[in-house]
Amino acid sequence: MAQRREPDPPPPQRRILRTQTVGSLGEAMLDSEVVPSSLVEIAPILRVANEVEASNPRVAYLCRFYAFEKAHRLDPTSSGRGVRQFKTALLQRLERENETTLAGRQKSDAREMQSFYQHYYKKYIQALLNAADKADRAQLTKAYQTAAVLFEVLKAVNQTEDVEVADEILETHNKVEEKTQIYVPYNILPLDPDSQNQAIMRLPEIQAAVAALRNTRGLPWTAGHKKKLDEDILDWLQSMFGFQKDNVLNQREHLILLLANVHIRQFPKPDQQPKLDDRALTIVMKKLFRNYKKWCKYLGRKSSLWLPTIQQEVQQRKLLYMGLYLLIWGEAANLRFMPECLCYIYHHMAFELYGMLAGSVSPMTGEHVKPAYGGEDEAFLQKVVTPIYQTISKEAKRSRGGKSKHSVWRNYDDLNEYFWSIRCFRLGWPMRADADFFCQTAEELRLERSEIKSNSGDRWMGKVNFVEIRSFWHIFRSFDRLWSFYILCLQAMIVIAWNGSGELSAIFQGDVFLKVLSVFITAAILKLAQAVLDIALSWKARHSMSLYVKLRYVMKVGAAAVWVVVMAVTYAYSWKNASGFSQTIKNWFGGHSHNSPSLFIVAILIYLSPNMLSALLFLFPFIRRYLERSDYKIMMLMMWWSQPRLYIGRGMHESALSLFKYTMFWIVLLISKLAFSYYAEIKPLVGPTKDIMRIHISVYSWHEFFPHAKNNLGVVIALWSPVILVYFMDTQIWYAIVSTLVGGLNGAFRRLGEIRTLGMLRSRFQSIPGAFNDCLVPQDNSDDTKKKRFRATFSRKFDQLPSSKDKEAARFAQMWNKIISSFREEDLISDREMELLLVPYWSDPDLDLIRWPPFLLASKIPIALDMAKDSNGKDRELKKRLAVDSYMTCAVRECYASFKNLINYLVVGEREGQVINDIFSKIDEHIEKETLITELNLSALPDLYGQFVRLIEYLLENREEDKDQIVIVLLNMLELVTRDIMEEEVPSLLETAHNGSYVKYDVMTPLHQQRKYFSQLRFPVYSQTEAWKEKIKRLHLLLTVKESAMDVPSNLEARRRLTFFSNSLFMDMPPAPKIRNMLSFSVLTPYFSEDVLFSIFGLEQQNEDGVSILFYLQKIFPDEWTNFLERVKCGNEEELRAREDLEEELRLWASYRGQTLTKTVRGMMYYRKALELQAFLDMAKDEELLKGYKALELTSEEASKSGGSLWAQCQALADMKFTFVVSCQQYSIHKRSGDQRAKDILRLMTTYPSIRVAYIDEVEQTHKESYKGTEEKIYYSALVKAAPQTKPMDSSESVQTLDQLIYRIKLPGPAILGEGKPENQNHAIIFTRGEGLQTIDMNQDNYMEEAFKMRNLLQEFLEKHGGVRCPTILGLREHIFTGSVSSLAWFMSNQENSFVTIGQRVLASPLKVRFHYGHPDIFDRLFHLTRGGICKASKVINLSEDIFAGFNSTLREGNVTHHEYIQVGKGRDVGLNQISMFEAKIANGNGEQTLSRDLYRLGHRFDFFRMLSCYFTTIGFYFSTMLTVLTVYVFLYGRLYLVLSGLEEGLSSQRAFRNNKPLEAALASQSFVQIGFLMALPMMMEIGLERGFHNALIEFVLMQLQLASVFFTFQLGTKTHYYGRTLFHGGAEYRGTGRGFVVFHAKFAENYRFYSRSHFVKGIELMILLLVYQIFGQSYRGVVTYILITVSIWFMVVTWLFAPFLFNPSGFEWQKIVDDWTDWNKWIYNRGGIGVPPEKSWESWWEKELEHLRHSGVRGITLEIFLALRFFIFQYGLVYHLSTFKGKNQSFWVYGASWFVILFILLIVKGLGVGRRRFSTNFQLLFRIIKGLVFLTFVAILITFLALPLITIKDLFICMLAFMPTGWGMLLIAQACKPLIQQLGIWSSVRTLARGYEIVMGLLLFTPVAFLAWFPFVSEFQTRMLFNQAFSRGLQISRILGGQRKDRSSKNKE
């Protein structure tokens, strides 16, 4: 199945060019949306034509004709893209329609138009105006727009026919025109005068905000200003500063909603007069301007926010300031990523605003102050935004799509940080075009030498504050304190272990202590290295640095160098008997004087004094915060030396409690790690090292360059290197262990996993309603309810329902049932399960007890009956049994009470009523006295029960003809009660019952006089309410469900969701506010071009195995498919297919199970549904509450038209609190090309009317003046909603669905300059509303039950959580919903699940370093919109755009928290290639983060322990992963050196050398990381916590059986390769991983292309190393270490080589193998070249693989060459081991001779290559003879050498092992030096050699796979292993993979 199944796009509109049939052309043109972008103005006319066509085809024709004319006027030369085709098609249609429509028209077209226009006005507009209420504003708006278009056409037709327009029509048109101005499409608030009756406009808070904005008193308007109705201060700002009209409309609504929402929180009871509260204004203003004021303070400027002294004007002034900021922000486009640039613009414009209001006079002109950029239309966009935007755009072009080095272009951060320096004011206002900010680059300036001379100051600014240079040194530079700490600890440990006894106590011995103090010399050297690095890596930013910063860098180097000298000298002087280097230093400084250790100690104390100060500040974070924020010069001087002054990264320190928690975490971790390193790795290695250094080895196996070197340094390095690498890496292992323990404890204290199973849910269900009302229902603010809420819920059990609980029960029922109904709508449960899970909606006034959902009470009645029947009068026994099971008690009591009510309701007759009352009063008496069992005979109960069930069944049917049967049933019941059950009772009862039937016995009474019993019954029940139906149905369930409902719901997902939701109610969450008082929020989803809704074709299209998506889904979700069929009332699939109306239902069902936009939208719209229900529960009066929300929904249609109804109010509140914007970047492109995705998005908008779609509109504008008409693209940010649905006039045709433009804001140019996704979010963020902003990806999902908790979650923004600041990002947990697809998907979802739960829990608390990891986090919207938005967008460097939002938030004093009582669904990748692409993207992103300024600043501004947290949870994880792989390399190359040099043989007698415990410990650590231990630990803990440790153990074993270790080892290679490559060479890019279902087989060539460089090459290299070691190694045979090392590393090799084939579906199926081989051969031998994609030819792929070297720079290429040299070691070592030379000749000439052999072979290959080109066509025979001779010569020489014998078979193998790596090394060097090789003209030979190597590698990989494919059981085993997860869900995967072939063959036979 395709990785990313794009729906096949329907043909674009250009198909109209072709000659088509009349019908199809007509259909194509009917779509008024498929219009070229340059003719966008005619779309409304075509819409109207479609609308009126059914009622008057001639008018439709005239509209289209007018559209054609207008199109011709707009683009006379048809120069726009697609215009000529469009016009031609339209003309063809007009020619056809002219003839057909002429017949039915009136005398002339003018008359036709006039009469139709009047008809339309009367029929639609007047009818709507005359309606009882004019609430249907949307239809009115639509009608006015249509009328306006009709008049435009009418006027044109009249002009053509020279007819005057009638006065009556002109008068009508004037009315229409006036109203069209008022009735414009709106987003949320209709602000026109006629909309005051709309529910949302009636809210006092909205009225207050609107009134405040309309106060324009005292504003100086321009001279020619005409006053408009409802003018407000934003109109004034627009006229003064030249903002766009739609920007003003958008921000007006934004500001009103913002103020209204904050205002209502100040007044919880909104009865006051609508006057805006000053506190609300102050709160919003504080949030909006906190960053601006901080910026002014930082630069030492006074802010421009001057408030007037007159109190009455203060409010207006504040609103003006806020309005101005929002208008600037709303039009700033890409400048929104540069918050301080916006501050600069605002600073000047606000000052101008103040000047105008104060009436200031300009000292320059002597006139009143005016805005520098005037108030013409679009002045702000053209004159302020565009120049800065163009600078960004130019810089982005220089990045060449991210290929250039970061240091040669300025990214968003560089441009923004220009405004962090006081120099930014040189830019001036109006801004100087020649300012250095705008200045061109050095290259551009070289072209304009003359200008440079005249204005030498204006050179390219260069980078600002920081340079992102590709270098590993960034890891040391950003986290220098960490590396210094580890290096110094290592030195100290080695010194202690080396000297004295090796015990830690030895440190107290004088000499040892003094030696340990040498770490301070190392510290000084490291400081010097850091200072030098700082200068080297910041060199390219020197132009932007101030003198103070440059001075600091130089002084840092000077000071560090001085300290190195001082430390070294004083150390030398501290020794009495100095030796070695100490003596040398002493001699330099004339040192024969006595020793003085005290001098060294003094030096150390002085050196440490700054550190002591910082340690003191660390203990008191509040002092540190104060100092960093302070602007006092002395403070600034103090801080200047420790860290350069920077606008961000100040005052980030946490509270003392948080600091204590994470400090303790790290102290425990570091002590454990260092103790382990010392006792297991370093101390045991010292003894063997000393022994090795004592031995002298004189015999070598190769030519030794330094035969007399002392101490065997090579051996020591080979021994210590892996251990030291593991020392630096294993903190990651300790982090995994400690964080798992801490996370587990933390989770347990948060009460996670208290309800894990259905059994637990049942046992706790009694306390759920209480917890529900405590958590999800707003409480009164009385003191009692303020107490900790849920402590009481344990004890709270509702048996009886006191009257005060009526409302609580009703609220619980409404919400619970909404959740269960959503389960049913999602097909997670069947109808029967739904009935069992529902709680009665309607409270029954006759029952005074809680009515539990039937799934708790199922089968309780039959069991109770059996117990009662067999009780034999033992009352107490039965009572005991009932007391144990409270649900049984409830069931019995409810059934009895309902039975009583039912009989009393049915029976109307007086006499019967009396009898029944007597019976019930007797029974009640017995119940009260507790003598029921002893006094009554209950053995007849089952019979009575049977009769009662029959009665209920008749009542369910409710048919007239059953009345007689009911009478019989009632008589049977009466007889049973009086004769059997109550036989001992008073005889009068019997008398009453039986003697009353007939008056006399002896005489035949006439029929009409005979009186029947139960003749008067209320049956059938005519007034059947929903409540009555529900009651009867429930009673029927209680009585008839015999089997236990223990497994209800049976669906695993439904169980998981129910248990999680129930559990979350007992977790700590903020109390719920009323909907009206909650924080408002938006959801923003970026969408590019993924699937919106699966098409039927896409669902049924089969892959090569004959499997369609639909078939696959049916097999994976069998229960949900059955439930779906039940919901749509179909028995089977055939029935479903037969009904066309269900096609869309089927598409939706499938789309809800994929990763589609439809699924995401449905999930997010649950928020709205939840808000509407909660608003109802908040506002409903008791009577309405008890009637229920269902009753309200039933009347919603009519109610929505009246603004005052409860339904309308609920809708209004939901609108005010929640907005959902989907940013469909390419919507207009899709729409104009007729793409199915645009139609599907429109369908979504129609289904959910409150969705808004934002998109970037590209409009071509043609310039008519020029000869051919040049095109210019204009870009807009647009927002649309679904237009009200209108049927074409007088037609029965389907409803026409269209969108409606709300805002269209012009942009300065293309919006996408950097990374696509953040830019897409940024353009749409202006259309979001509210105080919270949730970012949701389009592969996410949400649930109804979680949506109810949203208002609680938003309250977290107002709590400090024991810290120093409120949260700015709320983290949420995610649930990965794609885990059931395959084993890989299961591993991936487990890994992701553990990260998004336990991982982030620990990051947030205690570590305080949680950032933002993808979505569904919720941002404090105002905080982030004033600080650069919700992500960063610079090309490549911000590849992981989301984490940078977290970095930015933290650096700007934000606070990120994590909350686990709410969850959001998320889809993940499900195939190995998809997963690897995802891992590659993340690793690339981490590589770029390593170079970034944000991480550097965090590393330097955090305190030491928080910095450790930051490192090990971001790039540290990837660097440690890389060290893990490096350890294996270093170990093996070290062994290679020992083995081939003969040193291992010489040392093999040393027992310590053989039993090397430290190496065992080190490599065991490496193996732990390799097999995924770091992943598995937190995974197991989280599963244990949430599903029980028993389950965790089972899952762990299952994962191992399904080769999880293979998967994790393989991913290790992916992470290492892409992280390393990004750091060395760059080349990071966004990789779209696809959202499809992967059960398709990946071809061998595809796997080879993807994994060749990342895994296969490295795997083969390690294999050769292991083979050499296996052949020549001596020392370890039979030792545990040997086995451990061999097994572990061979496991890695085999995994890296064969995992892609192991995890490839059908990877071992013989037919597939044969196809793969053919495909591979075709690919490898295909010629490349321009236009040949890498998938088609090896040559193209190979060239693309080398692309990263082109942009790598000198450093990268040098490193590549240096690393390639390692391949020459094999040849050097192995030639001396050939039998000819071994032990005989160690001359260097032997090695030289081996190079002659290689060169000889290469020359022959080259010669044959040249021969092929020269002779193969004309002299083919000659060429073949030469080839044959060469081959025979080679064979003859080989046979001679073997016969003599000069060489052996083993030697041949050794030669292969020696020469293969050499060739590869030469190839790597040639690739790195490609330009040089091309100049030499031997590039084609290099290519040939490379192809040869690829063929050999391909064969090596393919042969074992093909061999295994011979055995059929291998394929069977692989399928089992891959799809075990799916098996457990009843998925017959063999049928999926090999499936449906039978179906196909049978179809073929037919």
From Swiss-Prot:
Sequence ranges on the Cytoplasmic membrane side: 1-481, 527-552, 621-655, 734-1511, 1582-1591, 1677-1682, 1777-1787, 1850-1851, 1916-1950
GO MF annotation, one: 1,3-beta-D-glucan synthase activity
Keywords: Cell membrane, Cell shape, Cell wall biogenesis/degradation, Glycoprotein, Glycosyltransferase, Membrane, Transferase, Transmembrane, Transmembrane helix
Catalytic activity: [(1->3)-beta-D-glucosyl](n) + UDP-alpha-D-glucose = [(1->3)-beta-D-glucosyl](n+1) + UDP + H(+)
GO annotation terms (biological process): (1->3)-beta-D-glucan biosynthetic process; cell wall organization; regulation of cell shape
Assembly and oligomerization: Interacts with UGT1 and phragmoplastin. May form a functional complex with UGT1, ROP1 and phragmoplastin.
Broad EC category: transferase
Glycosylation sites: N577
UniProt entry tagged with the keyword Glycoprotein: yes
Key word Transferase present: yes
Protein role: Involved in callose synthesis at the forming cell plate during cytokinesis. Not required for callose formation after wounding or pathogen attack. During plant growth and development, callose is found as a transitory component of the cell plate in dividing cells, is a major component of pollen mother cell walls and pollen tubes, and is found as a structural component of plasmodesmatal canals.
Family: Belongs to the glycosyltransferase 48 family.
Coiled-coil parts of chain: none
GO CC annotation, single: 1,3-beta-D-glucan synthase complex
Cellular compartments annotated: Cell membrane
Pfam family, one: Vta1
InterPro entries: FKS1-like_dom1, Glyco_trans_48_dom, Vta1/CALS_N, Vta1/CALS_N_sf
Ranges facing Extracellular side: 503-505, 574-599, 677-712, 1533-1560, 1613-1655, 1704-1755, 1809-1828, 1873-1894
Gene3D superfamilies cross-referenced by the UniProt entry: Vacuolar protein sorting-associated protein vta1
Topology class, membrane: Multi-pass membrane protein
Membrane-spanning ranges: 482-502, 506-526, 553-573, 600-620, 656-676, 713-733, 1512-1532, 1561-1581, 1592-1612, 1656-1676, 1683-1703, 1756-1776, 1788-1808, 1829-1849, 1852-1872, 1895-1915
EC code(s) of this entry: 2.4.1.34
Organism superkingdom: Eukaryota
Protein's name in the database: Callose synthase 1
Annotated SMART domains: FKS1_dom1 (SM01205)
Regulation of protein activity: May be regulated by ROP1 through the interaction with UGT1.
